């Protein structure tokens, strides 16, 4: 791409991920990594597929976005309305986009944007997904892996880069010799997954979390961060109660500090009044 395609193969970014596509030219196919981005904001729960909106996305791609939306609502919208909207886009994409092989990448970018947890740009990912979060096989896996490997090689291999693929596609691997050597030497990695949860844990380097009896996810987990942000949007939707609560807490803290300071002052004054009497009594005793 001679540096014209904006791709990052190191560092961490919010709502940004390396997706993989296949370009067919005559009888040849080659893989092309693409930057996929997600932006979120307070809204009514709509997910805008920009490719579809400008008639660059096909029906299979649109189906993938709907499946992703269904997964989000099933996981996080059982007890509350999702008060956010989002937009998804393949950056620097000027042709038709179809197929559902970017569904896992799109959902990962969206969860990163909501949770405010960055994605490791050392990884590229491909895979379709069903409503249950199970990852499904895709086509062109070899070309996709080789395409991202070439991009990493141009920017410099770090030993941390690699591609995340559906486990079912492992049987289809027939990679170039240089890619196989890089994998053998630990310079490049291929990781197989079965679920979206496994993908998120690799991309964000923390557990997704488990749901407890109270309907909350494990602290400091990916899904807990998602729920925290959704609760924040819910509080804003409910009105001024969210804004008043922190002020009340601050006032209580100030009142406690003031009472403590006054108590300390009274104690000091009492000590000051008692000290001369004690000295005087001691002198009389002598």
Predicted regions and their residues:
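Peripheral, non-AAA+ core regions of ATP-driven protein-machinery
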Residues: 2-6, 16-18, 34-56, 60-286
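N-terminal amphipathic/basic leader segments beginning at the initiator methionine
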Residues: 11-24, 30
């Amino acid at each position: 791409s001679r540096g014209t395609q904006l791709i990052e193969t190191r560092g961490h970014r919010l709502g940004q991920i390396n997706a993989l596509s296949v370009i067919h030219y005559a009888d040849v196919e080659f893989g092309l990594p693409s930057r996929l981005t997600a932006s979120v904001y307070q809204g009514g729960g709509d997910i805008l597929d920009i490719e579809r909106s400008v008639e660059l996305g096909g029906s299979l791609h649109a189906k993938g976005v709907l499946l992703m939306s269904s997964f989000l609502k099933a996981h996080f919208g059982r007890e509350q309305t999702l008060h956010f909207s989002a937009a998804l886009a393949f950056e620097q994409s000027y042709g038709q986009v179809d197929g559902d092989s970017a569904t896992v990448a799109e959902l990962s970018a969206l969860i990163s944007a909501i949770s405010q947890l960055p994605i490791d740009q050392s990884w590229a990912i491909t895979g379709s997904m069903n409503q249950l979060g199970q990852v499904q096989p895709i086509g062109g896996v070899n070309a996709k892996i080789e395409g991202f490997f070439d991009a990493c090689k141009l920017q410099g291999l770090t030993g941390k880069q690699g591609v995340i693929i559906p486990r079912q596609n492992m049987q289809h691997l027939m990679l170039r010799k240089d890619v196989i050597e890089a994998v053998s030497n630990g310079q490049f990695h291929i990781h197989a997954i079965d679920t979206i949860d496994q993908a998120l844990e690799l991309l964000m380097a923390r557990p997704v979390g488990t749901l407890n009896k109270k309907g909350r996810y494990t602290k400091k987990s990916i899904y807990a961060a998602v729920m925290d942000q959704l609760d924040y949007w819910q509080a804003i939707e409910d009105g001024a109660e969210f804004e008043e609560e922190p002020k009340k807490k601050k006032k209580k803290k100030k009142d406690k500090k003031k009472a403590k300071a006054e108590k300390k002052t009274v104690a000091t004054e009492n000590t000051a009044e008692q000290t001369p009497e004690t000295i005087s009594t001691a002198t009389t005793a002598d």
